Amino acid sequence: MKLCVLTIASLLVTVTSLETQKEIAEGSELTREETPSLVEHKEDEAAAASEKRSCIEEWKTCEHSCECCGSSTICSSTWAEGKEIKLCKNEGGTFKKVLHFIQKGISKLKSCKEGN
């Protein structure tokens, strides 16, 4: 639910020009101090960028496969450093993250056994 609200809010911020935002703020008699959601939005964008960077670093080892993802993740393809890589984003709580870690470990063990 929070993710949906943030997505909708980010779309509105992107679509709405800065001038329109000022008019809305003036019309509602709001000041920057009274609109902390703008600061939160910037912090969320920074956190998402950081998460994506760590995801790219993690998936350099699984460049052409999403098998390491497990069922608790969404897999998508992207380009980084001239290579197509797979990105996986965890969807779930601590339990699913533990399962993801175990699945990833098993997958790496299998690939090591197949290599030897």
Swiss-Prot record:
Keywords from the UniProt entry: Disulfide bond, Ion channel impairing toxin, Knottin, Secreted, Signal, Toxin
Keyword Coiled coil: no
Record-level Gene Ontology MF annotations: ion channel regulator activity; toxin activity
Compartments, as annotated in UniProt: Secreted
Main location: secreted
Disulfide bonds: 55-69, 62-75, 66-112, 68-88
Region annotation (Disordered) ranges: 24-46
Tissue distribution: Expressed by the venom gland.
Top-level taxon in the UniProt lineage: Eukaryota
Signal sequence bounds: 1-17
Residue ranges annotated as propeptide in the record: 18-53
Record-level GO cellular component terms: extracellular region
Function summary: Probable ion channel inhibitor.
Record family assignment: Belongs to the neurotoxin 03 (Tx2) family. 02 subfamily. HNTX-XV sub-subfamily.
Domain notes from UniProt: The presence of a 'disulfide through disulfide knot' structurally defines this protein as a knottin.
Protein name per Swiss-Prot or TrEMBL: U30-theraphotoxin-Cg1a
Upper lineage: Eukaryota, Metazoa, Ecdysozoa, Arthropoda, Chelicerata
